[in-house]
């Protein structure tokens, strides 16, 4: 409901409340009290009391056993005039009561419509709350997607990535080839070193054998020389 419609409904509600100020259950009591206390002038008697006096005077005159038709007619006319004057406020009160009843019906209709609009507004508020929550979730998802998109945009193109990967694979292959060659060379060096150690061992054994032979030969020579010297003596 728009702001203008709310103002119209509010103004209409205030008007109804102002025109229908009394509960319907108290209407009869209020009207009866007004009939008993209403005055036609500022300092005059209540209409009901005046009507009662006119009626009493007319009845008293009727009860007289005299030729008083003219007086009875005058009193009857005065009573009818007073009755007519008394009836006018009654008619006005009936009009007011009818107007109040119409206003009451209008007020009830307006109340029902206002309650319906309040319920509709509450339902709309709940729907808006749900939409707001969904909008928050959607906005959060959009922000996350935007962050991912920026992160992806900051990365190099796929072609460059593939090129880098290809270069890395090539370097890895070259390193593997170098590693294989180094391993083979290391194995060769191991074998050569083992052979060298074997040769050294053989040379050492040969040298030891030669030294041993030389020592034995020297000992034999010394022994032979000693024996020869003794024989000469």
From Swiss-Prot:
Complex and partners: Component of the THO complex, which is composed of THO1, THO2, THO3, THO5, THO6 and THO7.
Family: Belongs to the THOC7 family.
Subcellular location field: Nucleus
Organism of origin: Arabidopsis thaliana (Mouse-ear cress)
Taxonomic lineage from the root: Eukaryota, Viridiplantae, Streptophyta, Embryophyta, Tracheophyta
Protein name according to UniProt: THO complex subunit 7A
UniProtKB keywords: Coiled coil, mRNA processing, mRNA splicing, mRNA transport, Nucleus, RNA-binding, Transport
BP terms from Gene Ontology: mRNA processing; mRNA transport; RNA splicing
GO annotation, cellular component aspect: THO complex; THO complex part of transcription export complex
